[in-house]
């Protein structure tokens, strides 16, 4: 039995915490036992995660008393691997590793610049969620030999082409209308603004842009939306109707991978994405969707017009999309690769 201590200093439950949940739940419980070290009040404590929760004070990187407490826990529970995800828990985990002799693995979920390569190079292994993230780490001085890419996996049983709800029925739209969809937090980096502008300028008949998500850009986007743009806010039932989109767009200025694109393609929805970060790995250009030049409105307009007006091309991409995700981005693939990595440390 290989005992693992996951550490996560974040209090929220976003993309990286969701990935950690999926990995923990998917691990072979006859081979791996997981303890999950979290701050008191962490939203992960409320989730269905197949582990033993442990509360630590992870709010400061150099809390000596807490580090010693974690060291004691590691020795008592014969922890062999410490897995970290964020800045503070990454430093804590590395220090505990050096004191106790446990191996330490750092997962990098973002493509934003890192503060110091040293805090990564002291790990035994670094997991990058895309090759784009791996390349960015190397460019900042992280040792290539330490890095392994393990793509984030999506629930291909939950996100299927067989949608339970047609978004047209819910919104009172014509049954033959074309639905362009986006599911993303309304923040500047997701670049909804360029999508709204491109969609408005195309002004195609019987075509609607459905926007799922909320965030700080809500008011700004409300000011430029037209009657053919429908903003639904946050929805808990996205997987039920995602498959009824005719195409999905993610125009982010920066993206480590783009999990929303994976979920859409798992539902056999063709995608359009900006050619930045890991999006070029999440979309197979001209096979499951189209890439456009990052932050280039004309390039986005061309991609939108092409897919909106060409039903045969949409059907071709749709037929390829589901298989592409099942083969490369399933939870099972992510978990098996993680298990193999743990066993070879």
Where are the predicted features?
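Conserved acidic donor-binding segment of nucleotide-sugar-dependent glycosyltransferases
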Residues: 285-286, 290-297, 306-312
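A conserved, positively charged/aromatic
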Residues: 98-131, 135
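A short helix/loop element that forms part of the nucleotide-sugar donor recognition site in Leloir-type
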Residues: 160-173, 313
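A short, well-ordered alpha-helix in the C-terminal region of glycosyltransferases
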Residues: 169, 299, 306, 313-328, ...
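N-terminal strand-loop element at the rim of the active site
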Residues: 6-66, 148, 217
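A conserved mid-protein helix/loop that constitutes part of the nucleotide-sugar donor-binding site
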Residues: 14-22, 178, 182-201, 216-219, ...
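Aromatic "clamp/platform" in nucleotide-sugar-dependent glycosyltransferases that forms part
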Residues: 234, 253
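Short hydrophobic beta-strand element within catalytic cores of glycosyltransferases
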Residues: 38, 270-273, 283
């Amino acid at each position: 039995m290989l005992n693992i201590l996951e550490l996560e200093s974040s209090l929220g439950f976003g993309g990286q915490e969701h990935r950690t949940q999926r990995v923990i739940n998917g691990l072979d419980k006859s081979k791996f036992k997981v303890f999950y070290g979290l701050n008191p009040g962490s939203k992960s404590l409320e989730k269905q995660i197949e582990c033993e929760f442990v509360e630590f004070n992870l709010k400061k990187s150099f809390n000596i008393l807490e580090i010693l407490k974690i060291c004691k826990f590691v020795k008592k529970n014969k922890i062999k691997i410490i897995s970290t995800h964020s800045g503070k828990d990454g430093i804590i985990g590395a220090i505990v590793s050096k004191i106790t002799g446990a191996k330490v693995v750092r997962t990098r979920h973002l493509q934003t610049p890192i503060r110091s390569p040293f805090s990564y190079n002291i790990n035994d292994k670094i997991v990058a969620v895309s090759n784009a993230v791996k390349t960015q780490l190397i460019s900042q001085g992280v040792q290539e030999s330490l890095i392994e890419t393990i793509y984030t996996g999506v629930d291909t049983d939950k996100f299927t082409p067989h949608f339970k709800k047609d978004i047209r029925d819910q919104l009172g739209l014509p049954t033959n209308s074309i639905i362009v969809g986006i599911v993303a937090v309304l923040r500047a980096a997701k670049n909804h603004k360029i999508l709204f502008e491109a969609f408005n300028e195309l002004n195609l008949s019987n075509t609607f842009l459905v926007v799922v998500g909320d965030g700080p850009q809500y008011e700004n986007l409300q000011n430029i939306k037209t009657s053919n743009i429908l903003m639904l806010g946050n929805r808990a039932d996205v997987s039920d109707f995602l498959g009824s989109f005719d195409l999905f767009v993610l125009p982010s200025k920066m993206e480590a991978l783009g999990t929303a694109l994976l979920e859409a393609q798992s539902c056999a929805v063709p995608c359009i994405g900006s050619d930045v970060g890991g999006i070029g790995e999440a979309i197979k250009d001209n096979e499951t969707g189209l890439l456009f030049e990052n932050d280039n409105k004309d390039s986005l307009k061309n991609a939108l017009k092409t897919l909106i007006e060409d039903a045969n091309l949409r059907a071709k991409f749709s037929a390829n999309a589901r298989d592409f995700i099942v083969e490369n981005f399933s939870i099972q693939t992510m978990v098996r690769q993680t298990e193999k990595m743990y066993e070879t440390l």
